[in-house]
Amino acid sequence: MTPITDEGTTVALPFPTDAQKYSSPWKRTGTQIVIDAYEGNAINWTQMATDPRVVGVIHRATIGLQADTLYKSRAVTAQQRGYLWGAYHLGKSGDPITQAKFFLSTIGDPTNIFMALDLEDTSASGMMNIANAKIFLNYVFQQTGRMPVVYANNTVVKAINAAMKGDVTFAQTQLWYARFVSAIPGFPSGVWSTYYLWQFSSEINCTSTGHCLYNVPGTSFDMDINVFYGSKAALAAEWVH
């Protein structure tokens, strides 16, 4: 169980059967909001600071063998402002170890950094496939002692379930689940029994600033928004698992 603080009251919330976890959990004041951005997303840090529920920022560090131009400067800004900081690699086709080395060299000391591997479409020719994802994950683990979180949408999760049932590597990861709905009608249990973070809003399901499922001040409709079903303390404790 993970405690959740809701208006000053600590309530035990069982995982993964609690229906509230899968139905607009961002509407509960005790849950936490995390944005994830890349160089194309604008952030007004002063405005964003007016929302105390936004506690973390995950930023694209690398895509294939290219670095995000705003990663390093935003890493400094976010951490100076007290946000939990994270980095993700968007996996492309090509040697996964070379990509993993580039990702680690870009983020620097990973001690306090949430790390994730973004698997957008494992069946597309230009994207990282599941076999190479496993190599990437294992390399990062060997170098850091920590297994990255896996970002995947519903289709990719199902593909991983089919290909990696019982796999030791994927069993050590947590899921950053992309599904742009207000309620999840059926979580695809398999490798993962539940999500760690749920990305529920982006330009895919929000086309007008201020009219998203959740609106983070200082950002536009195209900002990716995620929810953590638990307290700020719980998220901080699990951030660099």
Where is each model-derived feature located?
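A short secondary-structure junction signal
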Residues: M128-N129, A159-M164, T209-G210
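Functionally critical loop-and-helix segments that line ligand-binding/catalytic clefts
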Residues: T2-N41, W45-Q47, D51, G166-H241
